């Protein structure tokens, strides 16, 4: 019941926004002489005076322990002290229960939507998850507040509330940013397409570095486009990055003290401009984050696999045996993950289409595994091993443009060593040599 009371109050506030805007527009349209113009101007000022009691704040939330929450969250807070309403505007609403959710997520077809609900519920949710919440109250004029409120109202309409989520380009953080910047005009000093020295991969490493397996999964799926330098505007795809830019944001226009929150004296940024953030406070204080305590890391697994591959290859050479079954296992184990990388080519997720790690975890291994093992079992050479050797060389060279997942280079080197040795062994094997002699003899006879 309490939730519906808050929602009803929020809807009532939106209705008042539209009514006051329409009244002001009608009065201003009848402004035909100077006396009436002055009178209507006063009416317009009085009609929007209630906006002085409205505070709009940027909410930045710390990371959680779930994989999807490692990177934090962004929302807006709309507080009307006169009406007693206090709501959170959240662009991160989604449902796991939607049909084919996992499949849709893999292919970048996940839909998120805007949600507006009581601020008390928002705080309770993040307090329960043990995540910090920082509030930055924004310094806005009445016109800007009105513009933001009307934009939120429009975005919350049934036909507009759902959007196609994109981790880098269109997420809860970028939505909140655009909602604010689109209504303050060209008055800012930051938020430009200024080149940086960072990349998308480096930025997410700052937040998943303590979660080695999550970082491995991200690095495995992200392609070479995640390693290009990004701009300052692209850098703001993460909640904490946007919060930092808001904290140093300067405004090139002068805002009168009467139009700022609580009539405080305008603060200035390091550049001498008036700051966009009026006040910063911690709703839920930050505390020590629980990090991954998994003793087994991806690199440890890669080293163990490399030792097994090299050890088996050496034993094979010393014993002069042909462990074709071991190669069958390797082809299947490296081919199955390759199916995921192949599927990423058709995904709508950004930066995953061109991924050179597919040359290491190659889905073609599943296609040629049977034919390759069949010929190896008979002691005959098969060209596919030589092809794999060249592909692995190319993959190692491509690390100039792409950072691979932890341990992938170690795996690639061990596989390359084995395939080179196997190709040489097949060339020198008696069965293969006898087959070559038989082919030559038959060719000469026909000739």
Residue ranges and their predicted role:
Residues 9-19:
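Bacterial N-terminal signal peptides
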Residues 64-65, 131-139, 158-167:
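Second-shell loop/turn segments in exported
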Residues 1-6:
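Positively charged n-region of N-terminal signal peptides that target proteins for export
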Residues 21-25:
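Sec/Tat signal peptide C-region and signal peptidase I cleavage site
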Residues 52-130:
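Glycine-rich catalytic cores of cysteine/serine-nucleophile enzymes that process amide/ester linkages
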Residues 28, 33, 40-50, 54-63:
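Early extracytoplasmic/domain-onset interaction patches
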């Amino acid at each position: 019941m309490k939730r519906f009371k808050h929602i009803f109050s929020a809807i009532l506030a939106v209705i008042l926004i539209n009514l006051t805007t329409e009244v002001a527009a009608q009065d201003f349209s009848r402004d035909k002489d100077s006396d009436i113009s002055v009178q209507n101007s006063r009416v317009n000022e009085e009609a929007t005076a209630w906006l002085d009691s409205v505070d709009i704040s940027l909410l930045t939330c710390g990371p959680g322990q779930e994989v999807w929450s490692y990177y934090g969250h962004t929302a807006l807070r709309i507080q009307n002290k006169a009406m007693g309403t206090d709501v959170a505007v959240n662009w991160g609403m989604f449902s796991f229960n939607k049909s084919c959710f996992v499949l849709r997520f893999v292919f970048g077809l996940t839909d998120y939507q805007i949600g507006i609900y009581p601020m008390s519920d928002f705080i309770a949710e993040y307090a329960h998850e043990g995540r910090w919440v920082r509030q930055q109250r924004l310094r806005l004029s009445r016109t800007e507040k009105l513009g933001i409120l009307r934009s939120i109202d429009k975005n919350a309409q049934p036909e507009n509330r759902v959007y196609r989520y994109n981790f880098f380009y269109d997420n809860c953080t970028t939505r909140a940013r655009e909602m604010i910047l689109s209504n303050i005009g060209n008055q800012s000093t930051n938020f430009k397409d200024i080149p940086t020295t960072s990349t998308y991969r480096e930025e997410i490493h700052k937040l998943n570095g303590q979660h080695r397996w999550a970082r491995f999964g991200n690095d495995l799926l992200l392609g070479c486009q995640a390693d290009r330098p990004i701009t300052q505007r692209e850098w703001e795809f993460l909640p904490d990055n946007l919060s930092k830019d808001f904290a140093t944001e300067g405004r090139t226009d002068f805002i009168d003290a009467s139009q700022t929150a609580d009539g405080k004296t305008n603060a200035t940024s390091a550049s001498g401009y008036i700051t966009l953030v009026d006040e910063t406070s911690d709703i839920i204080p930050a505390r020590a984050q629980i990090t991954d305590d998994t003793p087994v890391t991806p690199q440890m697994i890669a080293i163990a696999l490399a030792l097994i591959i090299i050890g088996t290859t050496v034993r094979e050479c010393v014993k002069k045996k042909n462990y074709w079954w071991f190669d069958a296992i390797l082809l299947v184990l490296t081919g199955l993950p390759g199916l995921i990388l192949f599927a990423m080519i058709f995904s709508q997720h950004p930066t995953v289409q061109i991924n050179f790690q597919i040359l290491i975890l190659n889905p073609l291994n599943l296609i040629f595994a049977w034919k390759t093992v069949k010929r190896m079992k008979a002691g005959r050479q098969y060209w596919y091993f030589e092809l794999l050797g060249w592909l692995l060389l190319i993959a190692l060279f491509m690390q100039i443009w792409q950072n691979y997942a932890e341990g992938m280079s170690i795996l690639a080197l061990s596989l390359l060593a084995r395939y080179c040795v196997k190709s040489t062994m097949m060339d020198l094997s008696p069965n293969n040599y006898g087959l070559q002699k038989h082919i030559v003899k038959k060719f000469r006879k026909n000739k």
